[in-house]
Amino acid sequence: MINYSSCSYLLKLCRTLKHLHQFHAQFITSGRISNDFKQNSVFANVLFAITSISPSASASKEVVSYATSVFRFITNPSTFCFNTIIRICTLHEPSSLSSKRFFVEMRRRSVPPDFHTFPFVFKACAAKKNGDLTLVKTLHCQALRFGLLSDLFTLNTLIRVYSLIAPIDSALQLFDENPQRDVVTYNVLIDGLVKAREIVRARELFDSMPLRDLVSWNSLISGYAQMNHCREAIKLFDEMVALGLKPDNVAIVSTLSACAQSGDWQKGKAIHDYTKRKRLFIDSFLATGLVDFYAKCGFIDTAMEIFELCSDKTLFTWNAMITGLAMHGNGELTVDYFRKMVSSGIKPDGVTFISVLVGCSHSGLVDEARNLFDQMRSLYDVNREMKHYGCMADLLGRAGLIEEAAEMIEQMPKDGGNREKLLAWSGLLGGCRIHGNIEIAEKAANRVKALSPEDGGVYKVMVEMYANAERWEEVVKVREIIDRDKKVKKNVGFSKVLS
């Protein structure tokens, strides 16, 4: 039998929604608590217990629905209760309007917000697609009115939100206006600057920090690597080690990525040796980075050895290995590792299929690619994207199946990006050149010209094909077009997409 004194202890043991339902049912049927204050207290504790449920542990809508029903049992909910329900909605349904509706209700009831109120409402505004900047600015004004921006957690959250959904200068202005900062404040803004590709300003802010932590170093090293500033990433990593700091796996993987991009395999191997000397634990994240590095630098056997030693392979680890095999033209091994991945219980994603299709293309495994492409939706529940159609079109074109390749491109999603369509039609044009299919080459050339009018390489290919077929009248017509169009004439020996 549940009594008031045992409620808090029992709620701490609840880790799933089912446990909370059982507690709730026992609490109601016991009928032992008639005091409204105690009843409100129990429901407030139930509400707080819901925050410990992982968003992945239960269906998000079910969690929010249950939390809302519990909240409605509370008479005159306090600031704590409103903060808790707002937090639950933000954690489980960040893109919904629930968090904001509860905040509006809170203000309508004249319940005063505190330091815990605004951060989760800010996050809910940022989680919505494209963000709700107008509402964020309104909430910003309210936080100022209540004097809550003096709280660093609130300030740091707002800086992060501005960096996500507004021009980065908004976050910088807020940073400059508030002299009260901690290392998290700097880290949040550095991360925002990196995401905005303002790497120079990120470095300036990093250099001005009175105190740095691992996150500070990781953010900048990762930013350099992402923007292909490989030397700067490697140099910063070396500086970090020279200062006696112990880099974690995030810094190591980012630097390995920079080594792979720059082809500096010796430095990458030295970093791998460093992990061995320091006896760092090679988790799936670091193993993925090492596999990716060695595969990109041409050491596919070493990549395979590291892959096999990894005991906790994730989707990303498998993708790194499969992509590496595809890059090296090992089509049969690519398919073999794909089968092993599926057998191990890992569900493939779109990246997996792009790599497998590329591997099949390099090895001429047409039937295997067809089967995998057909199974993407039916067997693996993976949506086909523009790149998948492009890979199939390239594979079919290489194999001389020009008509089928053209049909594949025609099936590409109508709302897809022009770049992917351009690459697909250009690849088909290249296949037509190899196999001498002028009829489809003309169709492909027209599509390429429509998507990239200044690409002179198209005309060069058509002149070559017409000349090989001794269709001299068409050769003359194409040359006349080249002579008339100055832009085409300028780029006739150059193509962005044709080899």
Swiss-Prot record:
The keyword Repeat applies. One of its GO terms (biological process) is RNA modification. Residues 424-499 are annotated as: Type E motif. PANTHER family: PENTATRICOPEPTIDE REPEAT-CONTAINING PROTEIN, PENTATRICOPEPTIDE REPEAT-CONTAINING PROTEIN ELI1, CHLOROPLASTIC-LIKE ISOFORM X2. Keywords: Repeat. PPR repeats lie at residues 78-113, 114-150, 151-181, 182-212, 213-247, 248-282, 283-313, 314-348, 349-379, 385-419. SUPFAM superfamilies: TPR-like. Belongs to the PPR family. PCMP-E subfamily. GO terms for molecular function: RNA binding. The keyword Thylakoid does not apply. It holds the Pfam family E_motif. This is Pentatricopeptide repeat-containing protein At5g61800.
